[in-house]
Amino acid sequence: MASLLVVSNQLADGVRPETVLPAVGLLSHELRSAPADTSALTESAKADVIVIDGRTDLANARMICRLFLSSGITLPLLLVVTEGGLAALNGDWGVSDFILDGAGPAEFDARIRLLLSSNDSDGLIQ
């Protein structure tokens, strides 16, 4: 079981992360949430994987991804995007992997497991 930090600009006080990303809520991972701002950096200290919600605000998602990258945090970043958002995604975002917003729990879980296994080794998926 991994500890996931869900970072989203749709997370207001009291809104649970599984409300924003329902497929993640069906998994057995520990879920925590943070707003898509600099406070997410502090919250990331207790996480194994950071899940960034880029479905509705790509510019802010890119800023958050780059903020994590520039801060030196080496945790895997999993970016959730719409199919239309793929056109904007490129290497300078600093994400470890992406997933489309319509993906089900099995795909989320597989990607999380792969990110954790690559983070434990030399960066290659084992």
Report residues per predicted region.
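Short, Lys/Arg-enriched segments at the junction into DNA-binding effector domains
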Residues: 117-126
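Short hydrophobic beta-strand segments
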Residues: 1-15
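Conserved phosphotransfer microenvironments
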Residues: 11-19, 28, 33-88
